[in-house]
Amino acid sequence: MPSSSDELIFFVNGKKVIEKNPVPEMNLLFYVRKVLHLTGTKYSCGGGGCGACTVMISRYNPESKKIYHYPATACLVPVCSLHGAAVTTVEGVGSIKRRIHPVQERLAKCHGTQCGFCSPGMVMSIYTLLRNHPEPTPDQITEALGGNLCRCTGYRPIVESGKTFSPESSVCQMKGSGKCCMDLDEGCSESTKERMCTKLYNEDEFQPLDPSQEPIFPPELIRMAEDPHKRRLTFQGERTIWIMPVTLNGLLELKASYPEAPLVMGNTAVGPGMKFNNEFHPVFISPLGLPELNLVDTANSGGVTIGARHSLAQMKDILHSLTLEQPKEKTKTHQALLKHLRTLAGPQIRNMATLGGHVVSRPDFSDLNPILAAGNATINVISKEGQRQIPLNGPFLERLPEASLKPEEVALSVFIPYSGQWQYVSGLRLAQRQENAFAIVNAGMSVEFEEGTNTIKDLQMLFGSVAPTVVSASQTCKQLIGRQWDDQMLSDACQLVLEEIRIPPDAEGGMVEYRRTLIISLLFKFYLKVRRWLSEMDPQKFPDIPEKFVSALDDLPIETPQGIQMFQCVDPNQPEQDPVGHPIMHQSGIKHATGEAKFVDDMPRINQELCLTVVTSTRAHAKITSIDVSEALAYPGVVDVITAEDVPGDNNHSGEIFYAQNEVICVGQIICTVAADTYIHAKEAAKRVKITYDDIEPAIITIEQALEHNSFLSSEKKIEQGNVDYAFKHVDHIIEGEIHVEGQEHFYMETQTILAIPQTEDKEMVLHVGTQFPTHVQEYVSAALKVPRNRIACQMKRTGGAFGGKVTKPALLGAVCAVAAHKTGRPIRFILDRSNDMLITAGRHPLLGKYKIGFMNNGKIKAADVEYYTNGGCTPDESEMVIEFIVLKSENAYHIPNFRCRGRACKTNLPSNTAFRGFGFPQATVVVEAYIAAVASKCNLLPEEIREINMYKQISKTAYKQTFNPEPLRRCWKECLQKSSFFARKQAAEEFNKNNYWKKKGLAVVPMKFSVAVPMAFYNQAAALVHIFLDGSVLLTHGGCELGQGLHTKMIQVASRELNIPKSYVHLVETSTVTVPNAVFTAGSMGADINGKAVQNACQTLLDRLQPIIKKNPKGKWEEWVKKAFEESISLSATGYFKGYQTNMDWEKEEGDPYPYYVYGAACSEVEVDCLTGAHKLLRTDIFMDAAFSINPALDIGQVEGAFIQGMGFYTIEELKYSPKGVLYSRGPDDYKIPTVTEIPEEFYVTMVRSRNPIAIYSSKGLGEAGMFLGSSVLFAIYDAVTTARKERGLSDIFPLNSPATPEVIRMACKDQFTDMIPRDDPSTFTPWSIHVS
């Protein structure tokens, strides 16, 4: 092996980079962040699944003389692969210092950024699209964003910012109506009498896009690419070598010398294997520049040959061109491939992954290989021994040795034949979400008929994601040859394929019965498609399928979302410089979009800084018998291993354990940490820590197991009104049931991050941390280090999303990090990778709800007895408070005169669940709405009618005896029903359902009464500190944390109004325990409420001090008044304080005033469900939210939309999977699916309804959490659709539709002849792969 390296040459943002010692194992993300210090490109998942690290890569093709720009996830791009390429990061697009690019400006001004962590990736995806298509269509914009995740905004404003570049995007966004969206047909409601606005930004402010001003591709790289004397390059690393051949013969010689070396082109298979499966390769071969791998040959009349180096995106373009050039009958395989190429992964991965790599790696989940095999494709391979063709068929995909490439062989190209006149080819798939998700089951099928007949001449069926490899139903196909394509053939085919493809009951991936059902459901779809095609070929000979079956043919479409946001216009008499009530851009919006907003891990490396990684328990409940750290300590770069023995103070604080000692109580509990000079060294050393255990019984994983063992974290909480037992004796009907609601992962884009810096004096320590509760971090670090809190400073500028997940968890992790910093005496950077973040920090509490409801024939509920149990995990965390909130909020919007509610948090051997947006309300109210739906079914009424009958209608007392006025609730409910055209659309859906057997539409409207703040008054207080400087500028600090919700922006608006100065005068640096001590958490939707009051108080104090000077010089300027005040020795600094809402709750008396006010709302959602697959599409959502007076409508609407989409994900596609032994499987974006841009409503309308709330700052309301529950309107719309399907099939319309309503849950509820056909296994004979923990 060569001992020296060649120089790696590439460009980054127009600047030449010459790397003399390139490291083959280093990726581009690490390189730009840690070597080039370009921190705008973010680390979020590390596996190419989230898009936060998106960059643009540009390459020159010397054959075509063209420059190709494409998006790529930097975390998967080996830096050595970039020789001769140009990389553009977000810093290269534009900056505040240089020039803001129109993409960055519009993303910020359209309010497409909240926490800002995903924003650079969004910018790069749109920017790359514009470099290739300066005037994109709306569909291209949606497609370009398909690989980017955002947890804050709900995507709508991001898409809207992109659509401003599209000439097809009109001002009015109502589609197909032929009239303006503001022409409301259904009467005038109270809100329409108010002056309502619909524009959150001014398009006239946007600078135009000028493609001619974009940076040119470096001419030097063109010369390099065209150099006829190129030579082989070798990059030598510490453990590995990277070789780039420049000729085909050179490649074949290398493959002969290193037959096991992987060919790295896109790195989308090799890279994840190294990161997640600990695969190691001493040699990499990268044949990126070989023209033989880049060919496209359409000269062969039998088909097309596509070079193995072509990316999947290039393949898509090639196939699309062919479908335009060739007759439709010849391109059926191409069309099937194109359908899957639209949804396979995201655009970044499609532009990186290559055809050759995808085919040869043969993933079991491949969406393309089954179609290629069904279309009789072949692979052209070559070695030093010569060329040959390998059929891309079942034996190849099943990895049979005789059908596979030899180790020394290289795939040159793939030949895709044209389809025959009497051949039909189709690809089918179903995934947890429409795009960027591995298929749960996919298939490639083709059939060829004897000419002019429906007699099967040849048949191929291949299925993915049902076995360790793609499998071919070859025996089934053989038996069906010669048969007629009719219903009997279908019935036999289903039986045969189920016998041939057996999914074991304990198969990896679970969902066994569902996957069995999908196999034959997809086969049925194929059968219908072929029937329809035959009918088109000869309508006289081949009858068409029944009209009611036609909708089963097509997948649910991907549409570009659009909508309207309505809010109250600002009073025209309000002073121009007063920003309150205006839709002002997030104060860091531009910095988010340029990547200049700094997060913790963006901070420069400190001298002697160490990186920290964790070693966690692999057992749910066990005694630790030994910990051997010797091998880890000996690893290069390791400074120390930290254990419980190193904690100088409390290792168990308030029930939270920092380092496990003697015993572990969950999988994922931190046992020790490794501190090393680099993250790579720390991570590798952590793998070498050896821990032995003795299991302890029982290991309690589920709620039911906890109930069986009487294992609880808290005492029972209860409220009761009326006489429940008596009422049950005097009702017409009683129903009982239970609902399981699974948990939810926060999936904030920035994982938990801490930088702990020990000081040289007085045992002081400074922590930079992403948190919602700096005081809590300070408390835990103080306890762990055994020093007073005044020695611990916690500083927090911003964090990349939180949603409750950064209330308590940063305190525990901060203590862990601080102990390491204390022991080593060096700064410690502690950044959890996504896998460990999901494993350690847990999320929303799973819940089991049991109900008994008594009601009258007319639907009036007279009595309810409800029990709630949550899975709290292994330590207290916030579980007791969550169960209190669940019990208090459990009535939602309904007055039930005899009501009993009890709740208890279960103790299990799972990582401790914690705060999450809505804090128990989203789980509890699903149970409420479920029993409302059950009552409706029993009474043969619409659920909306039952909701109306039982809703609070006048000033009333809650079950805990707090008085409130439901008028805003009634208003939101009525406007939602009216303006969503619910009853007309419901009727239209019923008509659709009559005419379509396999697809059903459903609608639901849910009301909401959501309480704000905390029942303990001391948690509602706040403080602020305001300084006025002599130039008139104002520095503002307060105790709240900027999480993306725009809290700092609102505080600047408050200060601007109170001091009567332009908002540009006010600056806000960070939140710190030094400037504002003892601050409470930023949660409970009360950040702006309480901190706004504190800022207001401080500003009013300052203005009062200035009043004598202002009176003497009323026409003077602000700066003059400030200067005069200083000269008169008037203090220009003031603290502000808000005592807090005086809330209380007496649990012994079961009464109190626990909440200062309520937020009301209603949402109507319409879905379409595919009963054959379980897929659903959200067609439209209308939200009416009681906003009172919005301080900033843009921010508040952003919170409502973002919460709704997060809630929709919680109730539909987000699914945490655990093994029976308590191991979390869902540890990254590949395994846990949050909504993408394709999941949001096709039509999305949000109206902010005006009301009064004099108790709060400017009569506003906290809207951060309320929208979460409204996402359940999607769940109950699905329930409505499934109920219709079940009724049509003669099944009961009362059934448990648990949450989340995943495709599996939906499909298995839509029972039919196919679900009846699948074999069932005896549960006592196997251990399932995964279990539910609710």
Swiss-Prot record:
The 2Fe-2S ferredoxin-type domain sits at 6-93
For this UniProt entry, the molecular function terms from Gene Ontology, in alphabetical order, are:
2 iron, 2 sulfur cluster binding; aldehyde oxidase activity; FAD binding; flavin adenine dinucleotide binding; iron ion binding; molybdopterin cofactor binding; NAD binding; protein homodimerization activity
Q: Which GO terms describe its cellular component?
A: cytosol
Presence of keyword Metal-binding? yes
Question: What does the further note read?
Answer: AOX genes evolved from a xanthine oxidoreductase ancestral precursor via a series of gene duplication and suppression/deletion events. Different animal species contain a different complement of AOX genes encoding an equivalent number of AOX isoenzymes. In mammals, the two extremes are represented by certain rodents such as mice and rats, which are endowed with 4 AOX genes, and by humans, whose genome is characterized by a single active gene.
Q: Which EC number(s) are documented for this chain?
A: 1.2.3.1, 1.17.3.-
Instruction: Give the main location.
Output: cytoplasm
Q: Which UniProt keywords apply?
A: 2Fe-2S, Cytoplasm, FAD, Flavoprotein, Iron, Iron-sulfur, Metal-binding, Molybdenum, Oxidoreductase
Q: What class of enzyme is it?
A: oxidoreductase
Task: Please name the gene that encodes this protein.
Answer: Aox4
Say which species the protein is native to. Rattus norvegicus
The UniProt entry's sequence similarity note says: Belongs to the xanthine dehydrogenase family.
Q: What is this protein called?
A: Aldehyde oxidase 4
- Where is FAD bound in this sequence? 263-270, 345, 354, 358, 367, 411
Functional note: Aldehyde oxidase able to catalyze the oxidation of retinaldehyde into retinoate. Acts as a negative modulator of the epidermal trophism. May be able to oxidize a wide variety of aldehydes into their corresponding carboxylates and to hydroxylate azaheterocycles.
